[in-house]
Amino acid sequence: MTVTGIIAEFNPFHNGHKYLLDHAEGIKIVAMSGNFVQRGEPAIVDKWIRAQMALENGADLVVELPFFTAVQSADYFASGAVDVLSRLGIDSLTFGTEEVLDYQTIADVYSEKSEEMEAFVESLPSDLSYPQKTQKMWEKFAGVDFTGNTPNHILGLAYAKACAGKGITLNPIQRQGAGYHSLDKEVSFASATSLRLHKEDSDFVDKFMPNSKLFQTSPQVSWDNYFQLLVYQILTNPDLTSVFQVNEEIASRLKAAVREISSVEELVDKVATKRYTKARVRRILTYILVGAVDNSLPKSIHVLGFSQKGQFHLKSVKKSVDIVARIGRKPWDMLTQQADNVYQLGNPELCEQNFGRVPIRVK
């Protein structure tokens, strides 16, 4: 039977995600971000709620991406997630994209010319951001055209790069309805961004989310819930450069701006430059919020939930993969658990995120 991997945030889970799961084949394994997501913000509902949403709509196994994989630029995010899924035995990767390209050929190009392509990236001017350099690489070596703001398209290329040489078949699915960051409400499939923005509109949420009641009754958070804590962290840390990816320039810009702002987005606007994109700044703010320092990734894989098919698959890979089903006195990943503790501070109704929690089971 085909074992299909899906890399996701489900922030929150909506009809477009269900469409993706419906079009995936065989056993469907989801590698999902935990309580903080790739663009550098807290997930609107916790990882357990999002895992349950996925399992109730076709996923067979949901595992958690460690913090240092989940909150990273596209290439590191894709590489870490593909590594997790590869160890779980996937032979196909299904993902949504704004533009269905021949990703398999693109992966082959990278497999053949990776050294030359990475050397090209290194040779580009330092005033370009890493995403800009990566785009120029794909334009030159694979003839990819970049038009508009298409994060899923960019992630698709990162997945192709991460899967190069691994024998994983790439299965892109055309994104349905609204674009990734679209705020449009008059569409057949609403974006996660739009659902976060219009979360109080119950009719809208009911229309575009298969688990709308679970979502609406679960504790929710946003950057606003952590703003004061973030400001405290910036003001009281004597050496911000001890935090992952914070250099002297970023530290100086943060210290100068933090007393002049009243929201996280204002801080992002003041600190971001051509070289430091807003997404990168948000990720850096997330690192500061949780006190992240450079750390190695866990070798084991944390399971959030499974169906009966998923449970059988877990048993089949258990001898070759270290699986963590319950986090107790022995930690799974200290940084991820530290981030979860901070996440819980955002809403007093949030449940314990690790200790005593067992995988969700669905029939």
Swiss-Prot record:
Keywords: ATP-binding, Cytoplasm, Ligase, Nucleotide-binding, RNA-binding, tRNA processing, tRNA-binding. GO terms for biological process: tRNA modification. Its EC number is 6.3.4.-. ATP binds at residues 7-20, 96, 152, 175. It comes from the Bacteria. Its main location: cytoplasm. Pfam families: HIGH_NTase1. GO terms for cellular component: cytoplasm. GO terms for molecular function: ATP binding; ligase activity, forming carbon-nitrogen bonds; tRNA binding. It is found in: Cytoplasm. Transmembrane segments: none annotated. The keyword RNA-binding applies. InterPro entries: Rossmann-like_a/b/a_fold (IPR014729), tRNA(Met)_cyd_acetate_ligase (IPR008513). It catalyses: cytidine(34) in elongator tRNA(Met) + acetate + ATP = N(4)-acetylcytidine(34) in elongator tRNA(Met) + AMP + diphosphate. HAMAP family: TmcAL. Catalyzes the formation of N(4)-acetylcytidine (ac(4)C) at the wobble position of elongator tRNA(Met), using acetate and ATP as substrates. First activates an acetate ion to form acetyladenylate (Ac-AMP) and then transfers the acetyl group to tRNA to form ac(4)C34. Belongs to the TmcAL family. This is tRNA(Met) cytidine acetate ligase. It comes from Streptococcus thermophilus (strain ATCC BAA-491 / LMD-9). The gene is tmcAL.
